[in-house]
Amino acid sequence: MEFRLPVLLSFLLFFLMLVRHWKRSKGQGKPPPGPKPLPILGNLHQLADGLPHYAVTKLCRKYGPVMKLKLGQLDAVVISSPEAAKEVLKTNEIKFAQRPEVYAVEIMSYDHSSIVFSPYGDYWREMRKISVLELLSNRRVTSFRSIREDEVWNLVQFISENEGCIVNLSERIFIMTNDIVSRAAFGNKCDDQHNFTALLEEILQIGAGFAIADLYPSLTFLRPLTGMKPALERIHKKMDKILEQIVTEHQIKRKAAAKNNTKFEEEDLVDTLLNYAEANKNEFHLTTDQVKAVTLDIFSAGSETSATSMEWAMSELLKNPRVMKKAQEEVRQACKGKSKIKETDIQNLEYLKLVIKETFRLHAPGPFTPREARETCEIGGYTIPAKAKILINLHAMGRDPTIWKDPECFRPERFEGSSIDFKGNHFELIPFGGGRRICPGISFATANIELGLAQMMYHFDYKLPNGKSLEDLDMNENFGMTCRRKENLQVIATTRIPFQK
């Protein structure tokens, strides 16, 4: 009996430990695979060699389409297959409808009032409704047609006036898209537009990469040491002054119309927001700061996405003369005899649309679509914990040989006869995201890109400066909120189709 009692107690203790382990394992579920993290750093050291999105994609090839990473203090899950992306963005879209908190956004977005980064809830739903039904509806995008045609034409004139000289095409494309968005959002090119654009550039540079404040959120004492907070506060103060002036000018015009008993004609996106605030003031209180936040959202996202995509499309066309020739022949045949292309002329340019799809496949405006798990759930057979940061890896899916034949080859013909689009319905190609938080500006961006590319291909032939061959064109990119070219695209243009000034 003396011998049996210790054995029985030992067995009971062992059994209780097994039960405890089983319960813990059941509660945690099956975690996604991933590389072993280091103390403090996690897996950050594995992203330090080269561009982070290339490093993450390389790890995904090894560990699979649902991969766990430890980024400092953050638990991140990288999604790299259309099937897993569909589970996140469609099957479980409410569970992943949250955007992760970003320190820079906290400072710049007027207390998370932007459409892009505001928390999932009543405010976000209301602003999303305004965006889809009012700000960026198809009717509204069509109403901006004359603005697009004017500003694309200004780009064509600039290139023509500098025929035979080196043109910084990247710079001119970004100026064009900024002008389009400025006129659509503010009603005209604002006096401080150059300063405003320069401030946006600063935000993109500061926000590029992984910020210490985001990777180690509990170590708040580190924030002053990086210099990020004072830099962002300085930029925000300057931007707020410009936006405040714009909103005030619009309010003055509205008051003048009311005083004179004249009908106020809505002109731009700021007018639309102010009209909504006035019409719904008893149901939904839209503050001036929220108007500024949404305006900043539209300006930054609308300009940056269109310009980055156009820049990469022109780069790929130059790098692939066969594709350039085919695209030029299509637009020149369709618009033969015309000195100026209008938006209605490009509706049937099917190959141009394939070029844009192929550009989005290889060069999504941003390499990752971020989400946050609102609750614990299962993706691809793995348990995703609540609060985990989700990175949908557009870069990996666009270059996956199991999805695309010869994925590194720029071949628009791969989409011929295909129903695949980039509007969130086909998860192998989601440059604008998907689900409830899909970018509401798809139509606006697409219209800018189509007209800009069509005009540039119609009127000009191009070569690289300084006798460089097309094979020498540098296709390296930067990492940031959007992935621009590392070096500006510089070309020498020759007029092929004359135009009338």
Curated annotation (Swiss-Prot):
Entry membrane topology: Single-pass membrane protein
Broad class of the protein's primary localization: membrane
Top-level class of the enzyme under EC nomenclature: oxidoreductase
Functional note: Monooxygenase involved in the biosynthesis of limonoids triterpene natural products such as azadirachtin, an antifeedant widely used as bioinsecticide, and possessing many medicinal applications including anti-tumoral, anti-malarial, anti-rheumatic, antibacterial, anti-inflammatory, anti-pyretic and diuretic effects. Catalyzes the conversion of dihydroniloticin to the protolimonoid melianol.
Keywords carried by this UniProt record: Heme, Iron, Membrane, Metal-binding, Monooxygenase, Oxidoreductase, Transmembrane, Transmembrane helix
EC number(s) recorded for this UniProt protein: 1.14.14.-
Cofactor: heme
One example GO MF annotation: iron ion binding
Pfam families named in the record: p450
Family of this protein: Belongs to the cytochrome P450 family.
GO CC list: membrane
Residues where heme binds: 439
Protein name: Melianol synthase CYP71BQ5
Pathway(s): Secondary metabolite biosynthesis; terpenoid biosynthesis
Subcellular location per the Swiss-Prot or TrEMBL entry: Membrane
Gene behind the chain: CYP71BQ5
InterPro entries registered for this protein in UniProt: Cyt_P450, Cyt_P450_CS, Cyt_P450_E_grp-I, Cyt_P450_sf
Signal peptide: none
Transmembrane spans: 1-21
Catalytic activity of the protein: dihydroniloticin + 2 reduced [NADPH--hemoprotein reductase] + 2 O2 = melianol + 2 oxidized [NADPH--hemoprotein reductase] + 3 H2O + 2 H(+)
Tissue expression notes: Mainly expressed in petioles and roots, and, to a lower extent, in leaves.
